[in-house]
């Protein structure tokens, strides 16, 4: 975890809540600006965490990072 003990998922959940609140459009200006700033910070922190994870995967895989397929329920249903 990071120094403030928030996980990537914690940050992402908060970012989703901020986006939802901003999309409603009924916030006072000051609150909207504060949430926007918080969202920008969270977005940068998430991007940093993702890049760090990607680099760790590169190290583990010897520099090879490939996209992978995630089976969804629809995909597995089509395969049967």
UniProtKB/Swiss-Prot annotation:
- Superkingdom, natural source: Bacteria
Supply one GO BP term: DNA catabolic process
Q: Name one GO molecular function term.
A: exodeoxyribonuclease VII activity
The answer to whether UniProt assigns keyword Hydrolase to this entry is yes
Q: What are its E.C. numbers?
A: 3.1.11.6
GO terms under cellular component: cytosol; exodeoxyribonuclease VII complex
InterPro entries membership: Exonuc_VII_S (IPR003761), Exonuc_VII_ssu_sf (IPR037004)
What the entry lists under Pfam families is as follows: Exonuc_VII_S (PF02609)
Name the UniProt key words of this record, in alphabetical order: Cytoplasm, Exonuclease, Hydrolase, Nuclease
Q: Cellular location of this protein? A: Cytoplasm
Task: Write out the catalysed reaction.
Answer: Exonucleolytic cleavage in either 5'- to 3'- or 3'- to 5'-direction to yield nucleoside 5'-phosphates
Q: Does this UniProt record's set of keywords contain Ligase?
A: no
The family note in this entry says: Belongs to the XseB family.
The task this protein performs is described as:
Bidirectionally degrades single-stranded DNA into large acid-insoluble oligonucleotides, which are then degraded further into small acid-soluble oligonucleotides.
Under the heading NCBIfam families, the entry gives:
PRK14067.1, xseB
Assembly, per entry: Heterooligomer composed of large and small subunits.
Q: PANTHER family under this entry?
A: EXODEOXYRIBONUCLEASE 7 SMALL SUBUNIT
Q: What is the protein named?
A: Exodeoxyribonuclease 7 small subunit
Q: Which organism is it from?
A: Maridesulfovibrio salexigens (strain ATCC 14822 / DSM 2638 / NCIMB 8403 / VKM B-1763)
Please spell out the taxonomic lineage of the organism that makes this protein: Bacteria, Pseudomonadati, Thermodesulfobacteriota, Desulfovibrionia, Desulfovibrionales
């Amino acid at each position: 975890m990071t120094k403030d003990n928030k996980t990537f998922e914690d940050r992402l959940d908060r970012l989703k809540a901020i986006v939802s609140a901003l999309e409603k459009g009924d916030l006072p200006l000051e609150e909207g600006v504060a949430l926007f700033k918080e969202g920008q910070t969270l977005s940068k922190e998430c991007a940093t965490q993702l890049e760090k994870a990607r680099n760790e995967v590169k190290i583990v895989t010897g520099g090879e990072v490939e996209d992978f397929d995630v089976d969804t329920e629809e995909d597995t249903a089509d395969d049967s």
